[in-house]
Each structure stands twice: as structure tokens, then as C-alpha cells.
UniProtKB/Swiss-Prot annotation:
Organism: Callimico goeldii
Biased composition (Low complexity): 26-38, 71-95
Protein's UniProt name: Homeobox protein MSX-1
Family recorded in the similarity comment: Belongs to the Msh homeobox family.
Function, as annotated: Acts as a transcriptional repressor. Capable of transcription autoinactivation. Binds to the consensus sequence 5'-C/GTAAT-3' in downstream activin regulatory elements (DARE) in the gene promoter, thereby repressing the transcription of CGA/alpha-GSU and GNRHR. Represses transcription of myoblast differentiation factors. Binds to core enhancer regions in target gene promoters of myoblast differentiation factors with binding specificity facilitated by interaction with PIAS1.
Gene3D superfamilies assigned to the protein according to its UniProt record, in alphabetical order: Homeodomain-like (1.10.10.60)
Signal peptide: none
Compositional bias of kind Basic and acidic residues: 127-136
GO biological process: embryonic morphogenesis; inner ear development; negative regulation of gene expression; negative regulation of odontoblast differentiation; nose development; positive regulation of cell cycle; positive regulation of odontogenesis; regulation of odontogenesis
Amino acid sequence: MTSLPLGVKVEDSAFGKPAGGGSGQAPGAAAATAAAMGTDEEGAKPKVSPSLLPFSVEALMADHRKPGAKESSLAASESAQAAGGLAQPLGVPPGSLGAPDAPSSPRPLGHFSVGGLLKLPEDALVKAESPEKPERTPWMQSPRFSPPPARRLSPPACTLRKHKTNRKPRTPFTTAQLLALERKFRQKQYLSIAERAEFSSSLSLTETQVKIWFQNRRAKAKRLQEAELEKLKMAAKPMLPPAAFGLSFPLGGPAAVAAAAGASLYGASGPFQRAALPVAPVGLYTAHVGYSMYHLT
């Protein structure tokens, strides 16, 4: 309680009054007095060594070097709490502020670690490192949330056109029946009801079978007739020779053409007469001229 007024007096003497005036105390003496008072204040407080703090670097490093570090750290923490009045965290039992164990034993969770702050057990913070099967939560292990197994993609089945279930089987005609039917078809393609009934009874067939056979035979005859007509049309088309497109003669005929060519090429303008080139027979061009004139008209 005496240090506060003395400090105030020092300020008054050091800053409030000019040097060498008033109280008559020198500036050097005032500084010495202030230093002495500060020393008394520091001596009055209990000194706590940094190595005694449980969470200091020196205390943590000393645990790894000294075998009996746990007992010394506990004693140091209790003495530090008693001397300095350190506040203990709420909800923490006394004596739990000790330093961690030696490296030989697993380190307990500190109060400032993730497990200490979240109040989780040590096993919850250690992940399972099993390479065989990853750890799953209970809802993932439930078959309700598990993904369905992969299905193999099978090729789509080939869908064929199905006949009616009530379709009648095909009638197997004998050779004698087929010959009689062909003979009758050549005579008459359309049968009356009476003729069909009589003819079917003679062949031991039903009227429906004879009727369907004649219908199919008429369709086949029509297809054959159309194919024959197409062949005749292809054969009737004229095949023009290549010379018919490159030759063009005047209306005078081949003889006039040959005479005009000889007069223009071998005229009597020169002193020497040359022998005339052999002219092709007229009959060679007659067919071409007539053929081309036929198509031009």
C-alpha cells in the first residue's frame, strides 16, 4: 500500500517539477528510488519458474528426457496452482493437468486436444486401418441402404414373328393330286362351285383346299407372265452402234459425199495429179445412213 503513493511522488518529482527545483532532489536520485521500489514490488510477488508450468515447452521436453517426469510434473503443477492461483478448467477433475506419459506408453488425451475439447474417447479418434474391409457406419451396413449388385447386361432376345395358334397345318399334296390340279388349271383357271365340288371329291380333298390352291396358282401365273413381259421389253430395245452417233451425211447420199471429198482433197490446182484414194463401197454407209435417218425422223 505504500508503493502507490511513492510512485505518484516520483512522477510528480520527475515530470511535474523542473530539474533542480522544488524538493531539491536530483534526477539521478529519483531514478534510483524508482528502480529500488520496482525491485521491492517484484520481490514481494512469488516467482514462478517457466519450467514449473505443466504446459510449457521445457516441461514437455523434460518428460521425454527424465524417467520420473510424471511425478515431478504433478508436484510442480500442484505447487504452481497453490502459489499462483491458477484457475482450474470447469468440469475437469483435479490432478488431471499432468504432462503426458513417457513414449513407451500411449499418450493420454490432453485437455487442449481434439478429444479433450470434444470429450470423445480415444478409440473414436483412431481410425481402423484394416486393409481388408473399410469401416462402415451402421446405416451403411444395412441392406436397405446398400447399393444393389451390378447386373450383367444380357443381349436382347431375338423376337421372331409368331404365327397364330389356331393356324391350320399345311396340306401335303401327293404327286398324283398335284398333277391333276395342274392339268385342271391349264384347262380352266376359274372353277364354278359345282365343278370345284366334283373335282375336290375326285381328288379326296375339300373344296377349301382346292379353292386356295387355285388362288395361289393364279398368283404364281401372274408373276411369271410379268417376268416374261419384262424380258421381252429388254430384248426389244434397239442397241445403237457407236458409228451412228459420229457420222452425219447430207441428203445427197454416200456417192455425193465421196465425190465432194475427192474434189476438195485432190483438185487440179497442182501441176502434178495424185492418185485418188480408194473410196469405200457405198454399201458400207448405206445401213448407217438409213438407220440414223430412221431415228431422226
